[in-house]
UniProtKB/Swiss-Prot annotation:
Keywords: Cell membrane, Disulfide bond, G-protein coupled receptor, Glycoprotein, Membrane, Olfaction, Receptor, Sensory transduction, Transducer, Transmembrane, Transmembrane helix. It holds the Pfam family 7tm_4. GO terms for molecular function: G protein-coupled receptor activity; olfactory receptor activity. GO terms for cellular component: plasma membrane. The gene is OR2AJ1. CDD domains: 7tmA_OR2T-like. It is a multi-pass membrane protein. GO terms for biological process: detection of chemical stimulus involved in sensory perception of smell. This is Olfactory receptor 2AJ1. InterPro entries: GPCR_Rhodpsn, GPCR_Rhodpsn_7TM, Olfact_rcpt. Disulfide bonds join C97-C189. It comes from the Eukaryota.
Length: 328
């Protein structure tokens, strides 16, 4: 019992990405700017979708949930990195580490399923446009988004509970910038082989199957696009599909490489580098790739900026008019 209490009460140490060198300071500032950009972009995306009825479609409904996941994802990791870097302390409590594991697995799993749902939405919209209003009704998109969250939470709860029950009786130093399961398993003095097999099974369900579904959907979309008579429409569709596949590959590729390798094949440098892609870079790129290049989103953004500008202008003129009335 004493050993078990020691396991649950001791803090972990996050070795992180940064040292005290000038290069690390620059790298830290770059990542912090990326974090601010990610939160700002995704928050703006949610506000735009919620505020204008033109964006109340299944595609943008799913995109709003993707933006919410991305905000939570970067906010789960980067603030702790910033705090540790500025304070010089690298500790994280057992409960804090458990929460990071739970939230990151929830969001990573949920986003994998949500990206697959979004590819299905695009497949139906482009390949079966006449059936789109029937197949993609409001409840269908709500079911896709809700299912992604719920399945992500369930998977995360199981893995978090299982991973944290291992005894950590050696070093408490996690050679990573956040509490990630593969990095934590290296600290366990118990045999984690069976659990690693479970991680591989989950990786097949949450990574390989959705990625295969996305690839198949975009493959069918490309075949449909090739049959279009308009060269401009073909060019636009190919451009959109290629950007989407780049982001999907940037997200799934490092994620698959991290979670489908045995513990013995993991190196701290590789794991940290790969994790930057699916925890920080992809959430920043998603709004640009999926939304800000879209004419509808740009039109709504322009209208919002115009209305805010006119509102400020009117607020300035009202006091002037009142003053003139008093003078008269």
């Amino acid at each position: 019992m004493g050993h078990q209490n020691h396991t649950f009460s001791s803090d972990f140490i996050l070795l992180g990405l940064f040292s005290s060198s000038p290069t690390s300071v620059v790298f830290f500032l770059v990542l912090f700017v990326i974090f601010i950009m990610s939160v700002t972009e995704n928050t703006l995306m949610i506000l735009l979708i919620r505020s204008d009825s033109r964006l109340h479609t299944p595609m943008y409904f799913l995109l709003s949930h993707l933006s919410l996941m991305d905000i939570l994802h970067v906010s789960n990791i980067v603030p702790k990195m910033v705090t540790n870097f500025l304070s010089g302390s690298r500790t994280i409590s057992f409960a804090g580490c458990g929460f990071q594991v739970f939230l990151s697995l929830t969001l990573l799993g949920g986003e994998c399923l949500l990206l697959a749902a979004m590819s299905c939405d695009r497949y139906v919209a482009i390949c079966h446009p006449l059936r789109y209003p029937i197949l993609m009704k409001e409840y269908a998109s709500a079911l896709m988004a809700g299912g992604s969250w719920l399945i992500g939470v369930f998977n995360s709860t199981v893995h978090t509970a299982y991973a944290l029950q291992f005894p950590f009786c050696g070093s408490r130093a996690i050679d990573h910038f956040f509490c990630e399961v593969p990095a934590m398993l290296k600290l366990s003095c118990a045999d984690t082989t069976r659990y690693e097999r479970g991680v591989c099974v989950s990786a097949v369900i949450f990574l390989l199957i959705p990625f295969s579904l996305i690839s198949a959907s975009y493959g069918q979309i490309i075949l449909t696009v090739l049959q279009m008579k308009s060269s401009e429409a073909r060019k636009k569709s190919f451009s959109t599909c290629s950007f989407h596949m780049i982001v999907v590959t940037m997200y799934y590729g490092p994620f698959i490489f991290t979670y489908m390798r045995p513990k013995s094949y993991h190196t701290p440098g590789q794991d940290k580098f790969l994790a930057i892609f699916y925890t920080i870079l992809t959430p920043t790129l998603n709004p640009f790739i999926y939304s800000f290049r879209n004419k509808d989103v740009l039109a709504v953004m322009k209208n919002m900026l115009k209305s805010n500008f006119l509102h400020k202008k009117m607020n300035r003129k009202i006091p002037e008019c009142v003053f003139c009335l008093f003078l008269c």
